Every structure is written in structure tokens, then in C-alpha cells.
Swiss-Prot record:
Residues reported in the UniProt entry to bind GTP: 11, 69, 138, 142-144, 204, 226
Record's protein name: Tubulin beta-3 chain
Amino-acid biosynthesis recorded as keyword: no
Family statement: Belongs to the tubulin family.
Tissue specificity remark: Expressed in roots, second node, leaf sheaths, and suspension cultured cells.
InterPro entries referenced in this protein's UniProt entry, alphabetically: Beta-tubulin_BS (IPR013838), Beta_tubulin (IPR002453), Tub_FtsZ_C (IPR008280), Tubulin (IPR000217), Tubulin/FtsZ-like_C (IPR037103), Tubulin/FtsZ_2-layer-sand-dom (IPR018316), Tubulin/FtsZ_GTPase_sf (IPR036525), Tubulin_C (IPR023123)
Annotated Gene Ontology cellular component terms: cytoplasm; microtubule
Subcellular location field: Cytoplasm, Cytoskeleton
Gene: TUBB3
Length: 446
């Protein structure tokens, strides 16, 4: 019941995805052959959200892995949980997208997309009542961004009423892999605004900062970064996989978090984040979790929530705790920081409680916020985009694959509209008089 189909694309998506499955397998007591070796019935109760039970009692992830080159997938296959995936669900090309969105979306990716869709269809038919899809990808490269968004739009056509959740790694301001990241990201956001229901926004720089500042890691690796992401991903979906007092699913999440359809880009955070050495010295209490969870340093994307206002937010607590205390703490945060919440959506913070904590912790919490400050990130990418596009730098790589300059202009203006929309709601107040005055002004202007 209520299955989620997981799709990972490109190098980044496959690496995050592989880590995510390690965490999920751990939580459900599944070893790397797919056999159950856990000790609690709760692990099996709703295991079919992410796993399909095959013959001989093996649990197979409902995962589709795609890439335009075989490299990353080979390393997933030879990784610790590589043998658990269905071999047919690895779909890869040979040519690579070369960090080019157009290759992923129009040429190389378009050739491979039908075989990916076949696998998606097969997995969807295996579901009792498919709830939705979750896609892991990055927006800076070619495959995850170009082919990822192509797949999302195709799935949208075929399954229009299912939820589409993405975990999208945005290019970060200082840590850049390729010079054309702003192009790829802007073209992708253009697609995500229209075709995705909820986007969890991640970025490497914020993750580096967390590893460096909070976790005190001297040289954080991508493995450490992906571990943070997978903890969050596991937290977002724990309500679906374990029983709890206040449950939520992808659709409830969307209903509570999205006041306007285009504004579905969320900041995520996770608590407790403690460095490995100091873990045992900290007593975890609900107030502590709540405090750390709302801390700007905990956000996994490079935007500061104190520069904007929260439209809505949702918190998922895990572990044995009192629901009453959770509610009190959440109210407490809202009352103390009321200026950071828009006053025209009362009770805009939702919490859910799930009884089973992550491995190795007594309690934990995952935070998802819809904050207007995320426009900082779009603004930054947009500025970099405009700087290059004004000079038509690197454009021939894209036009050579059959793209039109018009498409760039459209993507650019869509991104700018999105920023303007966030700004509009950040400035909006609850007083009626303002609206009447505004309307009069508009009439005069007209």
C-alpha cells in the first residue's frame, strides 16, 4: 500500500541514492543480499513502501537507476548494497552527457528515455497503490538535470495524479564543478517549477559548512555530504514507513507546505547533528532538537531563513516522545520568532511524530520549510546565468544539440518570475487596507 518509486539519475543522483538505500536497509533490518535480519515487526509492517517482496523472501528496492555513462552505476553495483537492486533496473548509456543539459534532455537522454520509462512502468505495475515518485538528481550536470527533468515531464504525462517529489542538488556559490552549471540549473528549474510537486533543495556548500562547522570534520568527503542528505531523505519518509502518532504522506506534506503552486521549493534540515566525538555527551531533549532544527546553520541549502519569512513549515520528529511537548515547543518557536513567519497563514507549522528513531539515535527530527529566503539561491544562479548568457558564452554547446536561444530566454524569465513571486509574498501583510490602496494605484497606473 502507498508505495513510493525511487528514481536516481546521473552521477550525483546515483551516489546520493546508493547512500539512501544503505540507510533505509539499515532501518528496516535488511542485509545486503535483500534478506530480512531485523528484530522488530515494526520494520516489516510497511516495508512495501520502498521494497517489493520477491520469491524466497528477498526484499528488492523499488528503485530505478539511470545514467548516460556506465561508470557511477558500476561503482553502485560493486558497493555494499549493490547486489540488492534488480539487475534490469540499471539503465545506462555509453556516451555520457558531458555536463550538457541539452544532451541529457534532447539528444543522448532522449534516446535512452524510453527504456527508462519501460522500467518505471514495470515497477509501477508492481505497486498496489502507487503514491508517487521520488527523484534524486543534481541540477548542475547534464544527466541528472537534463535527462532527470525529461523523465519527470514524461512521468507527469503518464501519471498525472501521482505525487512527484525531487531531491535536487543545486550548484553552490563557491564549490563549482563545471562552468556551465548556471545554464544547466536554470534550464532545470524552468522544468521543475512546472512539473514537480515538491522539491527538496540541497546544495553542496551548505552541506560542506555543516560538516565543517557542526560535525567538525577537517576534510569532508562526498560520502559525508551524502550521508547528511540520506539522513534527511530517510526522515522525510519515515512517517510512511513506520507507524506513528501523527502520520503524513507525500500528499499531506504538499497540502500543508504549498500555499501557491509554483512555490514548492523547500529548505530541509536535520537534527541532531553532532560531531562523532561529542555524541555521547549530549542529552537529547525535544526543546534541544527543536532549537537545533530551526537553526539557520542547519539548513542544507545556501539561503538564510532569517533573510526572509516562512510561508509554511513542517517538522517530523522521530523517537519516543510526548506529542504534547512537541506541539508546545513548535508553538514556542513560532511565538518567539513571529516576525519570521507570514501572519496571513495562521498555524502554518505542522508537526508529525513517528515512533521509530533512526539507527543509533534516541530521537531525531527532520525539518522542511517553505521560506521566501530561498529566492537568494535562485537569484544567485540567475545572476551567473545572465552574466554568461549576455555574452552568449558556451551557448554553441547547447545550440549544437538543437536547442534554441529562445528556450534560454524563457528559462531565465521563468526563474526571475519565481524570485519575484517569493519577494511578493515576503512583503505581503495581512492588513486589508493595503490591498485597496494597491488596487487604486494600479488603476491610476493603468
Amino acid at each position: 500500500m502507498r508505495e513510493i518509486l525511487h528514481i536516481q539519475g546521473g552521477q550525483c543522483g546515483n551516489q546520493i541514492g546508493a547512500k539512501f538505500w544503505e540507510v533505509i536497509c539499515d532501518e528496516h533490518g535488511i542485509d545486503h543480499t535483500g534478506k530480512y535480519s531485523g528484530d522488530s515487526d515494526l520494520q516489516l509492517e510497511r516495508i512495501n513502501v520502498y521494497y517489493n517482496e520477491a520469491s524466497g523472501g528477498r526484499y528488492v528496492p523499488r528503485a530505478v537507476l539511470m545514467d548516460l555513462e556506465p561508470g557511477t552505476m558500476d561503482s553502485v553495483r560493486s558497493g555494499p548494497y549493490g547486489q540488492i537492486f534488480r539487475p534490469d533496473n540499471f539503465v545506462f548509456g555509453q556516451s555520457g552527457a558531458g555536463n550538457n543539459w541539452a544532451k541529457g534532455h534532447y539528444t543522448e537522454g532522449a534516446e535512452l528515455i524510453d527504456s527508462v520509462l519501460d522500467v518505471v512502468r514495470k515497477e509501477a505495475e508492481n505497486c498496489d497503490c502507487l503514491q508517487g515518485f521520488q527523484v534524486c538528481h543534481s541540477l548542475g550536470g547534464g544527466t541528472g538535470s537534463g535527462m532527470g527533468t525529461l523523465l519527470i515531464s514524461k512521468i507527469r504525462e503518464e501519471y498525472p495524479d501521482r505525487m512527484m517529489l525531487t531531491f535536487s542538488v543545486f550548484p553552490s556559490p563557491k564549490v563549482s564543478d563545471t562552468v556551465v552549471e548556471p545554464y544547466n540549473a536554470t534550464l532545470s528549474v524552468h522544468q521543475l517549477v512546472e512539473n514537480a510537486d515538491e522539491c527538496m533543495v540541497l546544495d553542496n556548500e551548505a552541506l560542506y559548512d555543516i560538516c565543517f562547522r557542526t560535525l567538525k570534520l577537517a576534510t569532508p568527503t562526498f560520502g559525508d555530504l551524502n550521508h547528511l542528505i540520506s539522513a534527511t531523505m530517510s526522515g522525510v519518509t519515515c512517517c510512511l514507513r513506520f507507524p506513528g502518532q501523527l502520520n503524513s504522506d507525500l500528499r499531506k506534506l504538499a497540502v500543508n507546505l504549498i500555499p501557491f503552486p509554483r512555490l514548492h521549493f523547500f529548505m530541509v534540515g536535520f537534527a541532531p547533528l553532532t560531531s562523532r566525538g561529542s555524541q555521547q555527551y549530549r542529552a537529547l531533549t525535544v526543546p534541544e532538537l527543536t532549537q537545533q532544527m530551526w537553526d539557520a546553520k542547519n539548513m542544507m541549502c545556501a539561503a538564510d531563513p532569517r533573510h526572509g519569512r516562512y510561508l509554511t513549515a513542517s517538522a517530523m520528529f522521530r523517537g519516543k516522545m510526548s506529542t504534547k511537548e512537541v506541539d508546545e515547543q513548535m508553538l514556542n518557536v513560532q511565538n518567539k520568532n513571529s516576525s519570521y513567519f507570514v501572519e496571513w497563514i495562521p498555524n502554518n507549522v505542522k508537526s508529525s511524530v513517528c515512533d521509530i528513531p533512526p539507527i543509533g539515535l534516541k530521537m531525531a527530527s527532520t525539518f522542511i520549510g517553505n521560506s521566501t529566503s530561498i529566492q537568494e539561491m535562485f537569484r544567485r544562479v540567475s545572476e551567473q546565468f545572465t552574466a554568461m548568457f549576455r555574452r552568449k558564452a558556451f551557448l554553441h554547446w547547447y545550440t549544437g544539440e538543437g536547442m534554441d536561444e529562445m528556450e534560454f530566454t524563457e528559462a531565465e524569465s521563468n526563474m526571475n518570475d519565481l524570485v519575484a513571486e517569493y519577494q511578493q509574498y515576503q512583503d505581503a501583510t495581512a492588513e486589508e487596507e493595503d490591498y485597496e490602496e494597491e488596487e487604486e494605484d494600479e488603476e491610476v497606473a493603468a
